[in-house]
Amino acid sequence: MSRERATALLVDFDGVLRRWDPAVAAGVEREYGLTEGVLGEIAMSWGLLQPVLTGQVSHAQWMVSVADALTPAVGADRARAAVQEWQSYRGEVDPEVLAFVREVRAAGVRVGLGTNATDLLDADLAALGLTEELDVIVNSSVVGVHKPAKEYFQAACEALETPPGRVLFVDDEDRAVAGARVAGLSAHRWSGPADLRYLRAALAY
């Protein structure tokens, strides 16, 4: 028996709709005499990342923790300045993905943003001109649980007002894709804009 075609799309933010230029962080690290890759390494350490993704601490508090971790190496003032400069860059929208989102919405498909994010997400969406480009925002820090948890995807489907079996989820991380499938969603591991042809075929429009 063939699976029903999806009538709603849930798309990841970082790595799909938003992309980051790694040269920005590398430039900050060089400027402030930091070890290459240390900004991301500290920020993404699970002990700091998990609380901010579930809304237990704010984005600002998270960045204070990153600066505190850098302080022994470069001093408090330079650590704070480095983090501030790094954080001033908020990424870039992938124009091909945005065009796809607009296309499917115009065809009547509901589109949600499904992201592990902080309380800075709304400001980022506004700064990138995305506030009106999506029907639903499913932010882990608001939901209180993050991908790949089944509860996250249940909340996303409720927000989309669509049963899991009719939602197509797109993410660049294998764990998130696997979690979505466990929750009953169709899911595709994003590798780049070449995937858009498949996604168009998978959606009912």
Model-derived segments and spans:
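Asp-based, Mg2+/Mn2+-dependent phosphohydrolase catalytic module
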Residues: 1-11, 118-205
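Active-site neighborhood of HAD-like aspartate-dependent phosphohydrolases
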Residues: 2-44, 182
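Hydrophobic alpha-helical core bundles mediating ligand binding, dimerization, or RNAP-core interactions
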Residues: 25-28, 43, 62-67, 83-87, ...
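Alpha-helical substrate-recognition element adjacent to the catalytic core
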Residues: 29-66
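Metal-dependent phosphoesterase signature
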Residues: 52-98
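Substrate-recognition element of Asp-dependent hydrolases with the DxDx(T/V) motif
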Residues: 78-126
